[in-house]
Amino acid sequence: MHTTFEKEGIQQSAKDFFESENDNPSASLSLSFCVQTLDGTVILSGILENTPVTLTNIKPWDISEPNLYKIVCTLSENGTAIQTETITTGFRTTRFDTNEGFFLNDAHIKLKGVCQHHDLGALGSAVNRSAIKRQLLILKSMGVNAVRTTHNMPAAMLLELADEMGILIVDEAFDMWEMSKTTYDYARFFKEWSARDVKSWICRDRNHPCVILWSIGNEIYDTHANEHGLEITRYLKEQVLLHDPYGHALPTIGSNFMQGENARKCADILKIAGYNYAERLYNKQHADHPDWVIYGSETSSTVQSRGIYHFPLAKSLLTDNDGQCSSLGNSTVNWGAKNQQFCAVSDLHMPFSLGQFLWSGFDYIGEPTPYQSRNSFFGQIDTAGFPKDAYYFYQSVWTDAKTNPMIHILPYWDFNPGQIIDVRVYTNAPKAALFFNDTLIGEKKLAHTQEDNIIADWSLPYKKGVLTAIAYDEFGNEIARDTKHSFCDASSLRLSADRLEVPANGEELIFVTIDALDADGYPVDNANNRVHVTVEGEGLLAGLDNGDSTDYEPYKGDCRRLFSGKLLAIIAPTLNAGTITVTASSDGLKDAVLTLNTVACKNRDSDDLHIMTITRDPLADAVSHATDIPVRSITLSCEDSCILTANKPSTVISAVTHPANAAAQPLDWKVTNAEGVVVPYATLERIDDTHMHILAFADGSFFVRCSVTNGRGYTVLYSMLEFKAEQIGTMNLDPYSFTVGSLYSDSEGEIANGNAHGAATGSEGTTSITYGPFDFGLFGSDTVTIPIFETESRPVDLTFIEGKTKTQPGTVLCRGHYDKKMIWDTYQEETFKLPKRLTGVTTFTIQVTNRKLHIGGLSFKKLEKAWSPLSVTDIDRVYGDAFCKTDDAITGIGNNVTIEYTDMDFGERTCVVIEITGRSPIEKNTIHVRASNGTNETLNIAEFTYSDDYVTKRFPVNVLSGSQTVTLLFLPGSNFDLKGIRFVKI
């Protein structure tokens, strides 16, 4: 409620809570009320008039003390009760200050929020109170105090729980208005249904003290496209205020178009503006619009897979061969924050901002950027409810070390011997220290308001042992510690539940975590064993979820693989009191058994109870009896040094798979860069199944990767070892093979990770992406094909530059025009004709201004000299007694002139046609056409008759197969002007 507090108590009108309709104006109606605590203690009761009622001894609703009350109102006609309504609500004040941010009950609060989709992982979109509560508890432990319900009206249970748990809510309604985002979305119904839907939405939710803002839309293109968006904004604002006239919450919008004038006009109507991924605009637009309240309605969009680490940390990596995203903190999409540190700290330095809402709290089903997989990677928590490393990062920023000290190490500790591992420590303490086997590695003082000093980072070579991180307070006292042990193969399973006893009401759920331990009892953090789960007694298995976005096995089955060492089993009790026995088993491991209890419900009304319906996915039968033992990890080692030189350019690398009894399968070997893109600096030669010979033939750093599919048909895990080649020499790229977008040699301006190993340009300013150097050869190419993913379905121009380096600006070749309707997350090829052929060794630069584009890569069409039009500039050698060479012709060709074209490869053809474009001022020029490969030759005669202008004439000739030199010989008596030649297949 947006209420007014007074020293004596709280003034509140019944109209704030209820609406009534009087169909009989002549009847004697009265409205009585009773305000009571949740345990039934009456605070005040009486008859309501049209004057405010003052409540005394009321405890306000707050995020730290979410005090709630019941209000019972009874409408009576002539003394007879005809309707009774009961609500649970709370009393609080809110204030949105344009300079100081958000105040709850006059206390400043920075919104530490997340965006949440509606699904519940393995439960899908089915609403369950205990599942939602579990999500909110996990979020609160992270430090979250606010949730944005993206992008639809939330389940009533969510708001009820937010009231009870003290979580602020931005209650959002629409993801589109009249302009659709997909074919069958709500835009089809907006004009007819929006008024009715707003009424039901506001009237249902307006008495929840947790709700502080009504969001009327998310990333609405109508607000950007034209001024009709302003009309809809006014209309929706009016509809909200019509049903919430007392301003219990205020209307707002979440926009990714705030750089545009039209969207700013819409924001000016609302005065509370949510920005999606636009922190760069805050300060200027705060200065330009001092009457606006500003906040980050959607931020972050870093992507991460729990327990997956793509090294090195210094390399920004979006996609990789395993279909996962790195949890090191180096995996970001091009529209989101550059890293977690920026996202967390930038908002802190803008006191006028209400706060921010990370995208997202939990992973959710669908929208799986940057891959076409099962669910998203954006969450700080996976779909199973297991925190990712990013969770602990935000916990380190959003929680207080004095009340909830914490520290967290990443990654797990199981890699190749000697491999350089980036180790990160997150803590909310002012100082952290890292130890390896009790030896101090280093200490770091941290400042949680400084982007570059918020994480403690170290790099060290891997060897077996234990990492320990210790957090210290400002006085040097230890307040928290975390450890990561090296581990061996899984030996047993372990079960743990969020609670061991629940009421037998058919609605409560128990969430059981299954993980694997080695023989010494240490967690096997990369375990992927297949686990079978059975539930006996008064319970049912409602679902299994491991949080793996790439795992398509059914949720509604009885077996799944562990992912990064964990699996969640969701248990649904029946209506009967008793015990539930949960058993987890895996081939070769000790079973784990857990006993749970269900207790009879007191005062149980069977009409109010129902048992959860559990439906088994038919696809689950395909895997229910599987007993495969997958490869957990691959250990790579080099027989001597990983530094290759001109004197020793090769070595042998070996692989050992774990566990030893894993299913036999081929190992896939590649030479790649850090992103997993194949690079041409070295080659691999197979010795046997587990040994490869590597030979380097160019300087540079590269990785040998060894991967397995574990029966899934795609890479599921890999191991890599870094090599450096020195003093061998440099090499140029092949322009006629596809060069992946991320393999650029230089860049200027804003650049980010593109989809599928591409490169993404910035939306503001000019971005230049340089590739090469390429060796185009003597004849070269004048055609380039570029796969492009353009996100707005608007035309865009690209500028192409030759020869740009760090010291040379290069030469502008031309501008290319791209205009194709966007297909989401899909590259579409466009071929561009260049005004000249690129030859020799040079670079190629793509330049884009003020547009976000994904460049998937590029490849050039190799022109076949033998079959291409050859102008006088393509002549390799000309000599003789008389001729005059200009830019476009050789004129006055006279006695004993020889014109040579080298590297003419006709393949297997020996009979062709030569087209000669020239001018013969005499009756006839006899041109001798000779083809020679140094061993054999052919000689042909072309009689070019009189012409007063340039004409093209065709002559059949014999040539040799393969590569050769073609010569035009002009004997004494010749008088000819030549513009060019061309050979044609017959």
Language-model features: locations:
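Exposed regions on extracellular, virion, or secretory-pathway luminal proteins
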Residues: Q11, G361-Y364, A674-V677
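Secreted/periplasmic carbohydrate-active enzymes, especially glycoside hydrolases
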Residues: M1-H151, L161, M165-G166, D197, ...
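Extracellular ectodomain segments of secreted/surface proteins
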Residues: M1-N22, S396-G418, I629-A646, Y771-F776, ...
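Extended substrate-binding grooves/exosites of carbohydrate-active enzymes
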Residues: T80-E478
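Extracytoplasmic
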Residues: K431, H532, S585, D605, ...
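Flexible, low-complexity linkers/stalks enriched in Thr/Pro that connect modular domains
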Residues: G90-R92, W398-D400, K484-D489, V599, ...
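Structured loop/turn residues at beta-strand edges in well-structured enzyme cores
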Residues: S64, I109, M142, P209, ...
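A general structural signal for stabilizing positions within well-ordered secondary structure
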Residues: P60-I63, I138, D205, R264, ...
